[in-house]
């Protein structure tokens, strides 16, 4: 039986006049801290950019968060560390757990003294791309200084003209004692509670006044800051050590509505691979704009090839591109065969909702709710750039898709957020997002970034946002003051000191937390940001080609005397230049799942005949064979050559050796024969 409550609604307030159903809360996630700190939490370390944007005084460390007696304890200390007077801790569920709508709560007891700033809050999942406050922020509770009879709930967002807007209200609550702080949130309204008693609400229905940010997924953050713009800079040193106790954090969703509980088995981020072509669903030109069409493309690992499947009701999903935040959309609400699939800001129409139907072997049909047709690759194309459209369901393989789970990690570092530097300068940038860029016009200059986390071992794509008036610049990337050199990259001419482009290379890093360094090998150039993205394992991304593994040539973990350059081959990215005899590349932990024959293909280009490569395992201890490289008519005219080799079952480091130069290589594919 549906229970209706009558109530009075103001834009901001507590009194209400509407009718709504009583939520039936179902627990979907929690951390009770009975078995330590869950792996769903990620620690943020350091002092952030400009003191986390607030000129805060503390340095965040992992060591300042521990479990004591079944409770998470964040301890702020008066201790000198890396140039800061205070340490504390900050945890978030970003990259691991995020939710859209529901009830989020924590049972907490917090300290109260001059200079403290305690927060339990949430931020939009897209914060790395749109920046604050456009990503939206809801503070379940924040408390500052010695006002121990008050806690505050706040909401921050960006208005349509880009201005920062916020509302807040205080609750008469003594935070030193344990209380349950909750927020209930749906597509229409956000409500704040202490111990089940509501004290604040804000209407967000229809994205009014720019509040559409609160209709996206969010992640949760816990932290205790010391000092800053809001609490001030007068800190009571006698109050340390100070402890913030969290008994639990819980997330509920409403089981009495159609969204989002139900069959949510596909909820999450995926690479989407076509069964017929074995290429991947991709947003054309990696666009963030409404109206950009979908296409198929070679695997890149980028976020424009990752899609969030969010269950709405009865096997109906909203499908959102991770990079742009836009939803898959049937062009102009079309119902006919041949209508293109594009991306568009989500509005909840049936042309933006899809049923997902399993056909076995890990493949699915994706069916627009408004037309009942299949999302397919047009004309049975196997070419990169093939169009994505809707068509009648004839069980065509071009309309079947493998959903390959993405567990990507991405971190954006503002170039000016270094903790140490030499011979660099800051200046205002005209790049998107504004702020500052770093001027690198002295050879030997460098910047160091503290406590950069690489959560798992493997390949990472490192992107740099750069500008230069002339060619010839070069940077190098290292870890821990140069003890581990990851690679070098040429900085091209972009046509001006404020004409920006993004360059990248792939590096191999063991899991761990490092100080990351950028060194100016050759000046002059500017840099605005660095982005680190975990590249998912290729072995999990080539399931559409049975017993096949594709290796991007630039994904080596070690090398000698080769260089990277932009490629004109299908799929873009980088190729490796092999123009020195004796040069080599090594690829880590390549699996040969059974003994026998394997076809090894190489995507190569050369201006002249006479090139030769050799293939070996484990630093040359097993030589598998050699292969001549023909003239292809140019260093960006690509062809595929191959040979058959015999390999015993096992996992090896695979090497490619330049017997005779010069040639380029884009990828290697290994297929069990």
Curated annotation (Swiss-Prot):
EC number: 3.2.1.-
Tissue expr: Expressed in hemocytes (at protein level).
Class of the enzyme per the UniProt entry, highest EC level: hydrolase
Sugar-modified residues: 186
A single Gene Ontology CC term: serine-type endopeptidase complex
Marked site positions, Cleavage: 169-170
SMART domains referenced in this protein's UniProt entry, alphabetically: CBD_IV, RICIN
Transmembrane regions listed in the UniProt entry: none
Ricin B-type lectin domain sequence ranges: 266-404
Family the UniProt entry places it in: Belongs to the glycosyl hydrolase 16 family.
Task performed by this protein: Component of the heterodimer clotting factor G which may play a role in defense mechanisms against fungi. Initiates a (1->3)-beta-glucan-sensing clotting pathway whereby the alpha subunit binds to glucans containing (1->3)-beta linkages, which are components of the fungal cell wall, and the beta subunit catalyzes the activation of proclotting enzyme.
Name recorded for this polypeptide: Clotting factor G alpha subunit
